[in-house]
């Protein structure tokens, strides 16, 4: 007894020292009487793995479920070492382990029901335990020990693999009726003899059938367990479907469907709206039901499914694998597929119909969960202070419209208008304004003449900003085009007069003002154009308001409809992209029909300035003195539409070619007298520069041609040779004196036009440049105009020649039907020699040799005043022109008239003289039978006697 206690104490010390894991050692021998001395080597046993509830220790009995495999650790104390090798028994039936070896071994034998292996006398029909251990037929086949004992890693312990087979049909019920399964005891072979360990040593194993759970509770049949799992899964799917179908319907959407849906949708929305109105109560009810169903399903599957399975191999790591998470995995998959995916797929497409048909069930569930869910719903309402719903903000509504574009029946323009209206509050003026550099503006000192009004009308704008000075950002007024209704461009009214009269208010906004605010201001009638400004605090100094541009009502409307509005005058589709409008049959307005006629002055000057100009030219400018040109012809010349001109100065492009009146080494044929403004003159190769003002003139040599005689040229020799003619009076003329005419054979005023317009002989090339410095008004007379004026003056001063009476043949009293046009047949060849513009027969008494030397003078582009019309007002619309081919000329040495435009109404010849000369000339010409050559040229005889006229 003392030896056994000492051995037990020694084994306990070794176990405490070696087993650091803290495992509980099941030393059953300490709980029972001392075993026989022969069995002292087996001390106890315990299962290595009890996870999953398949193997457990209850009441000193090892319990295992059928179909499991587990690892068993046994503790023993080896006997004293043998002095000699054991002598084997002669036969296997006399006490050997049954395998032919002498190694220790464990086997299980089945105990009879109710026996428990307590005493051999309790079961008289069976032999005692040690005797049964020797018989292999008594070894249990349902509990199998796999392989021999293996070292357990700790002295005095060993490991052995135990597998419990499936119970045969009917054994589970019999075992269950007797105490919850079949009972097995342990037999141990120590190498010399078999030892039976039963209930006395705590070495019993009870195998329970699968009908019992981990705690030994009786489980229902498999079909009943499957049906319960399906019912719980269906309940979870029901709650999930109701939650998706009811809570996905927003109250706002239900109101929309109730008012604008189909008949079925209106009825369904009406039924659902009452339940959906209590959103938080409904939400708590459905979530509580779904959570309970999912939890019940997980517990049901845990008790119904095996947590793992074992194998038959010798290695635990290969065959004894357990899956305690298998029920959780099956539950998760079932809930995911059956309670989430399927309900969502159906309810997302038919949510309203499902919700309307399940209203009664929903009300029943809400009533059942009322004690718990109603207070919780009220608490949520108090905490959130609004119903749980889907509220669409402006941004969300915009994104909803964009996302629903492929599925909605809205056209693109309607969608753009909706989006533009919703985005109006998010945009500021700076994003849509027209920059100041792109605005059409007028200076406050502008004059509303024809050019300015035409430019305003051509721009197409109805409201035009007016700025003061040279800074465009200094906007002082607004001009409305309708304000020009009573303004005559001929009056040259100052713009400031009109703007001060109407006194339109300026509407200014800041660059960060929202478009909806500006639209409200425009709707109040203040103005449809606003000036955009910002506070400029950059740099040093005080902040100031800086004008950035303008914004109009049209700009805001374009942002609302998200499209450009184009009218007939727009040049760009977008002010920011600068994309030009395609020219699609678009015509620019031509206002030339409203201009002054050619007989009126295009540039208006005061009568005082016209008189001063006339006096200055008649007294100071040599070619226009009364010696060469009469004052009456000079006045007509100044009143010519193209003589007095204006030129605007562009500050942005000061070196523009149109700013030069003369350019060095560029041939010209006109004379210029500056009336208003300033010019800069650059002289010679040295580039000497100086400024000149009003009443300075240039280019006198340009109008002096070979049409003058040698004496005439010598009279104006100081004028003809000046390279730089910049004088206010003839006394200040300087330069070369060209005293001879380039054409010596033609020295009078009737020179040849071929020689007159020869580029090598008659073109004047100045060696100076004249550049304007401001807006100028000047007199510009071309060489042709001056020659026409000379000829008109010469014919005006010539007396009527009596030789012209020779043209009369006694029929002078017969007046023509139209003045200057005789009554001749339409097929008369003389008609082809007449021109309907400004024709007049005049005599040349100074040197005419015969009456046939009559010429017709054409005064090209020279207007005559209405006050000089005398006797021929009723015949002023028709004139007679004689082609140069029909005009007989005299020798080249004689002076002759040029082709000059001369009004018959102001001719110095009398009316009788004109009528007689016209009739005689036509009759004379009609009597000559001359034919044109096939090439349309005159005969050589005619060409030899004619000199072409100036055109």
UniProtKB/Swiss-Prot annotation:
UniProt domain CNNM transmembrane: residue ranges: 218-414
Residue list for modification Phosphothreonine: 821, 824
Region (Disordered): 116-135, 731-753, 795-830, 920-951
Membrane topology, as annotated: Multi-pass membrane protein
Biological process according to GO: magnesium ion homeostasis; monoatomic ion transport
Biased composition (Polar residues): 731-740, 814-824, 942-951
Keyword set includes Transport: yes
Alphabetical list of PROSITE patterns matching this protein: CBS, CNNM
InterPro entries: ACDP (IPR045095), CBS_dom (IPR000644), CBS_dom_sf (IPR046342), CNNM (IPR002550), Ion_transp-like_CBS (IPR044751)
Transmembrane segments: 23-43, 222-242, 282-302, 321-341
Compartment list: Cell membrane
Signal peptide segment: none
Domain CBS as annotated: residue spans: 433-495, 502-568
Keywords (A to Z) from UniProt: CBS domain, Cell membrane, Ion transport, Membrane, Phosphoprotein, Repeat, Transmembrane, Transmembrane helix, Transport
Phosphoserine modification, residue list: 850
The family this protein is said to belong to: Belongs to the ACDP family.
Its biological purpose: Probable metal transporter.
Leftover remarks: Shares weak sequence similarity with the cyclin family, hence its name. However, it has no cyclin-like function in vivo.
Annotated protein name in UniProt: Metal transporter CNNM1
Organism: Homo sapiens (Human)
């Amino acid at each position: 007894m003392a030896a056994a206690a000492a051995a037990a104490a020694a084994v306990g010390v070794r176990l405490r020292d070696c087993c650091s894991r803290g495992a509980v050692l099941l030393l059953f021998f300490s709980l029972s009487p001392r075993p026989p001395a022969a069995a002292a080597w087996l001390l106890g046993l315990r299962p290595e793995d009890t996870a999953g509830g398949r193997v457990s220790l209850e009441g000193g009995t090892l319990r295992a479920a059928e179909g499991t495999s587990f690892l068993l650790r046994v503790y023993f104390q080896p006997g004293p070492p043998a002095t000699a090798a054991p002598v084997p028994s002669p036969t296997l039936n006399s006490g050997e382990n049954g395998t032919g070896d002498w190694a220790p071994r464990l086997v299980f034998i089945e105990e009879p029901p109710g026996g428990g292996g307590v005493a051999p006398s309790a079961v008289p029909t069976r032999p005692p335990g040690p005797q049964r251990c020797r018989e292999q037929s008594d070894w249990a086949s349902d509990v199998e020990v796999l392989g021999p004992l293996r070292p357990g890693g700790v002295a005095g312990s060993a490991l052995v693999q135990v597998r419990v087979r499936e119970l045969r049909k009917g054994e589970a019920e019999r075992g269950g009726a007797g105490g919850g399964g079949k009972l097995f005891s342990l037999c141990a072979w120590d190498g010399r003899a078999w030892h039976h360990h039963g209930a006395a040593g705590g070495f019993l194993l009870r195998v329970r059938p699968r009908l019992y759970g981990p705690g030994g509770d009786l489980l229902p049949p498999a079909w009943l367990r499957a049906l319960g799992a399906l019912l719980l899964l269906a309940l979870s799917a029901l709650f999930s479907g109701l939650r998706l179908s009811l809570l996905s319907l927003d109250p706002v959407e239900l109101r929309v469907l109730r008012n604008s849906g189909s008949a079925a949708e209106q009825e369904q929305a009406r039924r659902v709206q009452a339940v959906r109105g209590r959103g938080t109560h409904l939400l708590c009810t459905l979530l509580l039901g779904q959570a309970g169903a999912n939890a019940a399903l997980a517990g049901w599957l845990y008790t119904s499914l095996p947590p793992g399975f074992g194998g038959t191999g010798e290695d635990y790591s290969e065959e004894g694998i357990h899956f305690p998470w298998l029920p959780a995995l099956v539950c998760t998959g079932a809930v995911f597929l059956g309670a989430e995916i399927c309900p969502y797929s159906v309810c997302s497409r038919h949510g309203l119909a499902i919700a309307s048909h399940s209203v009664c069930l929903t009300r029943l569930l809400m009533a059942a969960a009322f004690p718990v869910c109603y207070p919780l719903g009220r608490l949520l309402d108090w905490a959130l202070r609004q119903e749980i719903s889907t509220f669409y903000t402006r941004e969300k509504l915009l994104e909803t419209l964009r996302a629903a574009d492929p599925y909605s029946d809205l056209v693109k323009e309607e969608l753009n208008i909706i989006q533009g209206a919703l985005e109006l509050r998010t945009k500021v003026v700076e994003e849509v304004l027209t920059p100041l550099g792109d605005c059409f503006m007028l200076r406050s000192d502008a004059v509303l003449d024809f050019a300015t009004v035409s430019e305003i009308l051509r721009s197409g704008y109805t409201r035009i900003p007016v700025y003061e000075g040279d800074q465009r950002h200094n906007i002082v007024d607004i001009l409305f085009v309708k304000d020009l209704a009573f303004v005559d461009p001929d009056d040259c009214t100052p713009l400031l007069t009109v703007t001060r009269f109407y006194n339109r208010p300026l509407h200014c906004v800041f660059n960060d003002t929202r478009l909806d605010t500006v639209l409200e201001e425009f709707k109040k009638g203040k103005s449809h154009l606003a000036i955009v400004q910002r506070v400029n605090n950059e740099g040093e100094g005080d902040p100031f308001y800086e004008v950035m541009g303008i914004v109009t009502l049209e700009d805001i409307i374009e942002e609302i409809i998200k499209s450009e509005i184009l009218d007939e005058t727009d040049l760009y589709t977008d002010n920011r992209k600068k994309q030009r409008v395609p020219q699609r049959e678009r015509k620019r307005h031509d206002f030339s029909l409203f201009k002054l006629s050619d007989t009126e002055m295009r540039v208006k000057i005061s009568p005082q300035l016209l008189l001063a100009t006339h006096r200055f030219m008649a007294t100071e400018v040599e070619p226009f003195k009364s010696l060469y040109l009469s004052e009456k012809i000079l006045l007509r010349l100044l009143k010519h539409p193209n003589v007095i001109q204006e030129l605007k100065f562009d500050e942005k492009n000061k070196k523009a070619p149109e700013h030069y009146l003369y350019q060095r080494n560029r041939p010209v044929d006109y004379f210029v007298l500056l009336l208003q403004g300033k010019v800069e003159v650059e002289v010679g190769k040295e580039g000497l520069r100086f400024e000149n003002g009003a009443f300075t003139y240039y280019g006198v040599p340009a109008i002096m041609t070979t049409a003058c005689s040698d004496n005439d040229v010598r009279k104006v020799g100081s004028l003809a040779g000046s390279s730089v003619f910049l004088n206010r009076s003839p006394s200040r003329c300087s330069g070369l004196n060209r005293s001879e005419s380039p054409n010596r054979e033609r020295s009078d005023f009737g020179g040849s036009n071929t020689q007159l317009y020869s580029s090598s002989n008659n073109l004047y090339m100045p060696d100076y440049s004249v550049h304007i410095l401001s807006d100028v008004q000047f007199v510009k007379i071309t060489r042709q105009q001056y020659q026409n004026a000379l000829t008109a003056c010469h014919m005006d001063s010539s007396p009527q020649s009596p030789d012209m009476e020779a043209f009369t043949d006694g029929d002078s009293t017969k007046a023509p039907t139209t003045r200057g046009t005789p009554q001749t047949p339409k097929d008369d060849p003389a008609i082809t020699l007449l021109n309907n513009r400004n024709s007049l027969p005049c005599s040349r008494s100074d040197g005419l040799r015969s009456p046939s030397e009559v010429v017709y003078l054409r005064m090209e582009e020279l207007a005559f005043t209405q006050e000089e019309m005398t006797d021929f007002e009723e015949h002023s619309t028709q004139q007679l022109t004689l082609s140069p081919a029909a005009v007989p000329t005299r020798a080249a040495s004689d002076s002759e008239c040029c082709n000059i435009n001369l009004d018959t109404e102001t001719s110095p010849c009398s009316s009788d003289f004109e009528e007689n000369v016209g009739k005689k000339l036509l009759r004379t010409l009609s009597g000559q039978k001359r034919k044109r050559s096939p090439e349309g040229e005159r005969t050589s005889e005619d060409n030899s006697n004619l000199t072409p006229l100036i055109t």
